[in-house]
């Protein structure tokens, strides 16, 4: 699925959900890529072919994604979320082009992106500026309270420097994106949650604790 939404603790094609609930406003999620530069211990990507969001035919082209938008019942959209079953910044050029298309074609919608925040390391340059005027919210996975724990969980291919780079990216995003949040899941324990809160205080970042969903 390219465009999907939530349904019964799982996922469903956006247009199919609209057929079931034609009067509802729904968040539209964009499944952009299955690639990632992390290999998180908790990641649902390990399910691969057993998961609805695994792109079995490979990554959809930018034109195919645009056409999916043009064919979708946009009158039922609440917000647009660039998320899916991989790290969206792995297709950075296409991502910026897609966000530009959304901004120009559907200017009334708020757009959020979920990311691991490692695009500066992936491309060897500052990347937050590329999202200026294109995102209303960026949600960045903090995961843990220090670099060692972060690397143990994310198994980032960039090693121990990943944690600081992610935090620096989050701070940089505040210069270009109205709403910047970092997230952790609620299963990491109270002590770790409190430690993450202290990190966010140090970096002046907004923390959101989200429920872990294994679906």
Regions found by a protein language model. Give the residues of each.
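Conserved AdoMet/S-adenosylmethionine-binding subsite of the radical SAM
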Residues: 89-215
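Conserved beta-strand positions in the central sheet of alpha/beta enzyme cores
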Residues: 29, 44, 81, 139, ...
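Canonical Radical SAM [4Fe-4S] cluster-binding loop centered on the CxxxCxxC motif
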Residues: 18-64
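A generic local structural motif
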Residues: 14-17, 66-69, 124-128
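Short Fe-S-cluster ligation motifs
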Residues: 64-85
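Short, basic/glycine-rich phosphate-binding loops at helix/coil junctions
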Residues: 43-50, 76-80, 146-150
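Short, charged low-complexity linear segments at domain edges
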Residues: 1-27
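Flexible, charged surface loops at secondary-structure boundaries
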Residues: 21-24, 72-76, 132-133
């Amino acid at each position: 699925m390219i465009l999907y939404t939530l349904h019964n603790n799982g996922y469903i094609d956006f247009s199919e959900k609209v057929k079931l609930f034609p009067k509802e406003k729904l968040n539209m999620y964009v499944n952009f890529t299955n690639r990632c530069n992390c290999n998180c211990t908790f990641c649902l990507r390990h399910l691969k072919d057993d998961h609805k969001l695994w792109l079995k035919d490979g990554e959809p082209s930018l034109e195919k994604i645009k056409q999916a938008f043009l064919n979708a019942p946009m009158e039922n959209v609440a917000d647009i979320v660039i998320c899916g079953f991989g790290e969206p910044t792995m297709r950075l050029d296409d991502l910026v082009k897609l966000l530009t298309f959304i901004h120009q074609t559907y200017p009334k919608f708020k757009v959020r992106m979920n990311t691991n925040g490692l695009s500066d390391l992936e491309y060897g340059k500052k990347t937050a500026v590329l999202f200026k005027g294109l995102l209303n919210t960026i949600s960045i996975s903090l995961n843990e309270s220090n670099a060692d724990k972060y690397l143990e969980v994310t198994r980032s291919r960039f090693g121990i420097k990943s944690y600081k780079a992610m935090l620096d990216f989050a701070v940089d995003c505040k210069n270009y994106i109205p709403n910047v949040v970092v997230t952790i899941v609620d299963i990491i324990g109270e002590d770790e949650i409190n430690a993450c809160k202290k990190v966010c205080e140090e970096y002046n970042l907004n923390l959101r604790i989200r429920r872990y969903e294994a679906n």
